[in-house]
């Protein structure tokens, strides 16, 4: 019979795995926070579009691992006031960047989609970002 003070292997594994998931969740929240802060043009800004591509790849891989989609990213950006969704369907999104440089957002979303292995065409037309999923 096991006493109250002893921990079984299953309990230790569950505690360690839960701590691991909490750390992953916190890291994702921090990366999305800095993404939104960057896209808003706050005091933390990435001046180079190559940095936006790198950030897009990292967040894309993170979203893919967690089963999140492009729709989730655009929803988060709209929630923070960085973009305004003009129209959307299952394979088409039209957004208007509000507090974001459209070219930086284009490079970020392109890298995000590449990291998620989604074939797409991302273009900027008349200050709107058009995303077409192939």
UniProtKB/Swiss-Prot annotation:
GO CC terms: membrane
Keywords, comma-separated and alphabetical: Membrane, Transmembrane, Transmembrane helix
Membrane topology: Single-pass membrane protein
TM spans (from-to): 13-35
Main location: membrane
Subcellular location: Membrane
Protein name: Uncharacterized protein AF_1560
Natural source organism: Archaeoglobus fulgidus (strain ATCC 49558 / DSM 4304 / JCM 9628 / NBRC 100126 / VC-16)
């Amino acid at each position: 019979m096991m006493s109250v003070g002893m921990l079984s292997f299953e309990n230790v594994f569950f505690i360690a795995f839960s701590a691991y998931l909490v750390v992953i969740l916190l890291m994702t929240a921090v990366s999305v926070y800095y993404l939104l802060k960057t896209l808003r043009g706050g005091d933390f800004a990435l001046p180079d579009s190559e940095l936006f591509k790198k950030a897009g790849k990292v967040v894309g891989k993170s979203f893919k691992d967690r089963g999140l989609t492009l729709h989730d990213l655009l929803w988060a950006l709209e929630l923070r006031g960085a973009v305004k969704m003009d129209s959307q369907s299952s394979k088409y999104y039209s957004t208007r960047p509000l507090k974001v440089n459209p070219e930086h957002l284009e490079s970020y979303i392109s890298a995000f989609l590449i990291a998620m292995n989604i074939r797409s065409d991302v273009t900027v037309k008349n200050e709107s970002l058009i995303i077409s999923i192939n």
